[in-house]
Amino acid sequence: MADQLSEEQISEFKEAFSLFDKDGDGTITTKELGTVMRSLGQNPTEAELQDMINEVDADGNGTIDFPEFLTMMARKMRDTDSEEEIKEAFKVFDKDGNGYISAAELRHVMTNLGEKLTDNEVDEMIREADVDGDGQINYEEFVKMMLSK
């Protein structure tokens, strides 16, 4: 996951990590995490802090080292910037701007991307994403489909 980050992002995260790592020992404890979160106006409980650490503490030692921190940041970034990207992608597919992606619109975009799909393949893609069964994909269905891949 962290391999999807640019050099610039990694160096920014290194700075952020140093801010968290108050005693400079190369790891972030729940206490250090709490201090930084509170300075950012958050008020996490001890249990929440422990959960945050456990979520990314790959080696299970109770602290976060830099590689674990990078993984956490990469996850967060994927989650946030994907929302914007998904909105943009939906607009690309929804040619007529009516809030729905039809089979024809899907076929058109896929063809432009160099994916020659049969009618059956296009219908199958629509069916997989079409939760409410109206034969087209609305924004919610599109988001679900994009986040589940």
Swiss-Prot record:
The keyword Ribosomal protein does not apply. InterPro entries: CALM/Myosin/TropC-like, EF-hand-dom_pair, EF_Hand_1_Ca_BS, EF_hand_dom. The modification N-acetylalanine is found at A2. Ca(2+) 3 binds at D94, D96, N98, Y100, E105. Residues 8-43, 44-79, 81-116, 117-149 form the EF-hand domain. One of its GO terms (molecular function) is calcium ion binding. Signal peptide: none annotated. Transmembrane segments: none annotated. Ca(2+) 2 binds at D57, D59, N61, T63, E68. Keywords: Acetylation, Calcium, Metal-binding, Repeat. It holds the Pfam family EF-hand_7. SUPFAM superfamilies: EF-hand. Ca(2+) 4 binds at D130, D132, D134, Q136, E141. One of its GO terms (cellular component) is myosin II complex. Ca(2+) 1 binds at D21, D23, D25, T27, E32. Belongs to the calmodulin family. This protein has four functional calcium-binding sites. Calmodulin mediates the control of a large number of enzymes, ion channels and other proteins by Ca(2+). Among the enzymes to be stimulated by the calmodulin-Ca(2+) complex are a number of protein kinases and phosphatases. This is Calmodulin. It comes from Pleurotus ostreatus (Oyster mushroom). The lineage of its organism: Eukaryota, Fungi, Dikarya, Basidiomycota, Agaricomycotina. The gene is CMD1.
